[in-house]
């Protein structure tokens, strides 16, 4: 009986975490505004060292979450992205990922 109570409490905890982690498209639209400064420019390259900046509109949501978490933790190295991601909460990351995943990567469509 005790195990059942523990499992029930654990299930409630996990369900509340998933509800919190769900991304909000409209919030992501506001939070992703600065992303377009680099990622919204076709053929954009940042200065030394030169990196091609990928267009991230329409990218897979889970990929975006993993990438932003990697930049936040420092596992992925890019000074600009590390600094940008450092300020993001997990909710911010989810919101931004949901918004960007719903966009197009076709510049002519924008």
What residue spans do the PLM features occupy?
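Bacterial N-terminal signal peptides that target proteins for export
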Residues: 1-7
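Gly/Gly-Pro-rich "capping" loops immediately C-terminal to redox-active cysteine motifs
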Residues: 25, 29, 42-71, 82-84
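Short loop/beta submotifs within extracellular cysteine-rich repeat domains
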Residues: 46, 63, 77, 105-106
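Electrostatic cytochrome c docking/interface patches
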Residues: 15-32, 44, 52, 105, ...
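The canonical Cys-X-X-Cys-His
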Residues: 33-41, 96
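Bacterial N-terminal signal peptides
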Residues: 7-16
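Residue-level recognition of specific faces of alpha-helices
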Residues: 34-37, 55, 80
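C-terminal capping alpha-helices of c-type cytochrome domains
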Residues: 73-76, 84-110
